[in-house]
């Protein structure tokens, strides 16, 4: 049961959905060219995650999931702890613990599932 819950493929798909929909598509101001360019660049992460979910398996999948998700999780921690602000839509958004709990949990569990299936522990 725990192996199924911590299967990197499941978390790769969940992170891709969370990253693509509420993370990029919904908050983007599509009238702004810079925002469109940044959103397009960020959507490339979704392609990478989907390839990793469906094109790899086993320890290789776990290791690459860890290598991708681990730094993203650390990046969220640093941005939140510094209270950084960004503008992706019409209003500036400040990185707070409350607002960023869902992506922090998703990327963190993806990194954990990758670590546990990597064969490194």
Short names for language-model regions:
Residues 8-13, 33, 59-71:
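Membrane-interfacial loop-to-transmembrane alpha-helix junctions, especially the N-terminal start
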Residues 44-45, 65-83, 104-110:
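Hydrophobic alpha-helical membrane segments
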Residues 98-118:
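Final/C-terminal transmembrane alpha-helix of multipass membrane proteins
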Residues 23-26, 49-53, 79-86, 110-117:
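Structural signal for membrane-spanning alpha-helices in multi-pass inner-membrane proteins
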Residues 2-5, 25-38, 45, 85-89:
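Interfacial loop at the N-terminal end of multi-pass membrane proteins
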């Amino acid at each position: 049961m725990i192996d199924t819950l911590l299967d990197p493929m499941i978390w790769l798909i969940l992170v891709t959905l969370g990253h693509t929909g509420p993370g990029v598509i919904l908050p983007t101001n599509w009238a702004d060219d810079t925002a469109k360019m940044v959103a397009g660049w960020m959507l490339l992460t979704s392609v990478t995650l989907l390839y990793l979910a469906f094109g790899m398996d086993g320890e290789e999948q776990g290791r690459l999931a860890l290598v991708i998700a681990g730094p993203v999780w650390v990046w969220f921690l640093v941005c939140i702890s510094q209270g950084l602000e960004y503008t992706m839509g019409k209003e500036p958004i400040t990185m707070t613990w409350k607002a960023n709990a869902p992506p922090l949990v998703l990327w963190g569990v993806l990194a954990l599932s990758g670590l546990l299936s990597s064969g490194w522990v």
